[in-house]
């Protein structure tokens, strides 16, 4: 079923006509703004819909090309009912993530999403437009004629070495990145959902990440 058709079904059930990005149904009971500012619940839902249904956003973020959400989450009320039960909901600096529990996931839904600190979320963000022709973490040093591996840690670039092939450089990056992910996971262990922690501890960096 297409998102638009699903939205019309939800509209019919709720009796509301307020569509967000042409599909989202604002069936929230109460005001969505207080003192001229959107409530946190509305902003969170709207931001999720933007990533799923805004063509302008997808042009800027190609990795979201095929991303969508479950039929249930077209309803603001259903969305908030689900995410409010997730550990980390409403915590300042935490973000809704769709990729950690299911790597490569394209669906925002109750079973595929979780909340994580921005440090964790940014750690796993794909940046295809910044990668270039080589694997993630790899750059060619034209002066040395070798491939360099680099990893950003706490905003600073760590040099991992020079190698004869992009594959060797990537393996160095992969090893360092997976180790760093585990360090960050341990840092947040007591606050993360157990499933999220385990997903981070077993996370594998792929050459096309």
Regions of interest found by a model, annotated:
Residues 34-38, 46-54, 60-146, 150-151:
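Short, cationic Gly/His-enriched loop motifs
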Residues 65-71, 156-167:
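A short, exposed loop/beta-hairpin motif centered on an aromatic-Gly-Thr core
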Residues 24, 97-99, 136-137, 161, ...:
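Glycine-centered small-residue hotspots that permit tight backbone geometry or close packing
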Residues 21, 120, 128, 180-209:
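Extended, polar beta-sheet/loop recognition surfaces of beta-rich domains
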Residues 1-57, 62:
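GGW-centered surface loops in extracellular recognition modules
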Residues 79, 138, 149, 163-177:
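An aromatic-rich alpha-helical recognition segment common to small helix-rich domains
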């Amino acid at each position: 079923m297409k998102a638009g058709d699903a939205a019309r079904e939800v509209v019919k059930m709720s009796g509301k006509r307020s569509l967000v990005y042409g599909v989202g149904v604002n069936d929230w009971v109460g005001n969505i703004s207080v003192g001229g500012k959107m409530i946190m619940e509305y902003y969170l839902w709207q931001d999720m819909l933007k990533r799923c249904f805004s063509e302008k956003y997808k042009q800027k973020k190609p990795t979201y090309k095929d991303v969508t959400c479950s039929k249930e989450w077209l309803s603001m009320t259903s969305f908030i009912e689900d995410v409010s039960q997730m550990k980390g909901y409403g915590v300042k600096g935490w973000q809704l993530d769709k990729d950690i529990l299911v790597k490569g996931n394209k669906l925002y839904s109750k079973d595929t999403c979780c909340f994580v600190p921005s440090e964790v979320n940014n750690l796993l963000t794909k940046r295809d437009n910044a990668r270039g022709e080589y694997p993630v973490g790899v750059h060619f040093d034209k002066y040395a004629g070798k491939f360099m591996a680099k990893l950003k840690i706490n905003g600073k670039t760590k040099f991992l070495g020079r190698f004869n092939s992009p594959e060797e450089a990537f393996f160095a990056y992969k090893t360092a990145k997976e180790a760093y992910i585990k360090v960050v996971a341990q840092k947040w262990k007591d606050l993360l959902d157990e499933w999220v922690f385990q997903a981070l501890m077993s996370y594998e960096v792929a050459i096309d990440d």
